[in-house]
Amino acid sequence: MGPPSASPHRECIPWQGLLLTASLLNFWNPPTTAKLTIESMPLSVAEGKEVLLLVHNLPQHLFGYSWYKGERVDGNSLIVGYVIGTQQATPGAAYSGRETIYTNASLLIQNVTQNDIGFYTLQVIKSDLVNEEATGQFHVYQENAPGLPVGAVAGIVTGVLVGVALVAALVCFLLLAKTGRTSIQRDLKEQQPQALAPGRGPSHSSAFSMSPLSTAQAPLPNPRTAASIYEELLKHDTNIYCRMDHKAEVAS
């Protein structure tokens, strides 16, 4: 009679035990909680606009939360506090009237200014009175600052170039018009007869202009000479008539 065979249920394989132990450890290991974070929407905001400090991974079983201006929790920098049980918000020393806190702990800041630039700290108070904090920040810029969009810069450059071109065209037009007018006047002057120099001959203009002067400068006749001429005219020459009669008789 042979030896009794060993029961297979009594054998223990080592690697199966290790797998079972690892499974139990994974089952009892609590999941890792996500870290509380703050996201600025947007990160860079124009002056006069609004920004939202959005909270991610907010823990459960909270008593309340508070917002502070800066990187640390300080009573003098408290903006607003919120109690979940009473749903009551209490403003702090740093409250400006432009902040709004929501039930999910997010903070809205309206009409931002340059003084709002910097860090903001959120403190959440759990039911077991264990606090957790997170910090976020945002930037503020002026809308009319030099950092303009590419489209706006291109539009400004195009407008300047068009204006310069129009001014240049206007200047060229005025120069051409002035040059043409000068050329026409020069041609008209060349077509007109040139006046003779003094002593080279009279012209119509010179004759008319000088005639009064010549009349004024002409010597007046001597009164005695005029009387002698008048006396000669009064004398009758009878010999003339005699000669005329004599010639008539000869002809007959």
UniProtKB/Swiss-Prot annotation:
Residues 1-34 form the signal peptide. Keywords: Glycoprotein, Immunoglobulin domain, Membrane, Phosphoprotein, Signal, Transmembrane, Transmembrane helix. One of its GO terms (molecular function) is protein tyrosine kinase binding. Residues 35-142 form the Ig-like V-type domain. Residues 35-155 are extracellular. Tyrosine-phosphorylated in response to microbial binding. Tyr-230 and Tyr-241 are both required for phosphorylation to be detected. It comes from Homo sapiens. Interacts with S100A9/calprotectin. This interaction is calcium-dependent, but independent of CEACAM3 phosphorylation. Glycans are attached at residues 104, 111. CGM1a, the predominant CGM1 transcript, is granulocyte-specific. Not detected out of the granulocytic lineage, such as monocytes, lymphocytes, spleen, testis, colon, brain, liver, pancreas, thymus, ovary, placenta, skeletal muscle, prostate, small intestine, heart, lung and kidney. This is Cell adhesion molecule CEACAM3. It is a single-pass type I membrane protein. The chain crosses the membrane at residues 156-176.
